Amino acid sequence: MAASLLLRQGRAGALKTVLLEAGVFRGVAPAVSLSAESGKNEKGLPPNPKKQSPPKKPVSAAPTEPFDNTTYKNLQHHDYSTYTFLDLNLDLSKFRMPQPSSGRESPRH
């Protein structure tokens, strides 16, 4: 039943309940309020209006660039053939390091 109560309170409420029930932080004032209500301080009063910054002017959107896909050449997706993997495998085989062997002959399946 306690778990269902924690789930109904949400993350902030569950964390607050766990911290209060744990008894670890008794007598220590919380540095940060765990209240889910935004726009209010610890006493439930609205924030001081003097500290608010003036509203900023909206930034105008950058002009859109013309769309041109005639120069797009993605060879990775468009040059596949039946032997593409084998060709790349042969090209890269000269860069492979030899693998160590245990000295035993590998099983023949």
UniProtKB/Swiss-Prot annotation:
Topological relation to the membrane, as annotated: Peripheral membrane protein
Alphabetized InterPro entries for the sequence: NDUFV3
UniProt region (Disordered), positions on chain: 33-72
GO cellular component: mitochondrial inner membrane; mitochondrion; respiratory chain complex I
Protein family membership: Belongs to the complex I NDUFV3 subunit family.
Record: transit peptide: 1-34
Modified residues (Phosphoserine): 106
Main subcellular location of this protein, as a coarse class: mitochondrion
Species name: Bos taurus
UniProt entry keywords in alphabetical sequence: Electron transport, Membrane, Mitochondrion, Mitochondrion inner membrane, Phosphoprotein, Respiratory chain, Transit peptide, Transport
Entry keyword annotation includes Transit peptide: yes
Membrane keyword on record: yes
GO BP term (any one): mitochondrial ATP synthesis coupled electron transport
Name the UniProt record assigns to this protein: NADH dehydrogenase [ubiquinone] flavoprotein 3, mitochondrial
Domain of life: Eukaryota
Cellular compartment(s): Mitochondrion inner membrane
Protein task: Accessory subunit of the mitochondrial membrane respiratory chain NADH dehydrogenase (Complex I), that is believed not to be involved in catalysis. Complex I functions in the transfer of electrons from NADH to the respiratory chain. The immediate electron acceptor for the enzyme is believed to be ubiquinone. May be the terminally assembled subunit of Complex I.
Gene name, Swiss-Prot/TrEMBL: NDUFV3
Subunit-structure text: Complex I is composed of 45 different subunits. This is a component of the flavoprotein-sulfur (FP) fragment of the enzyme.
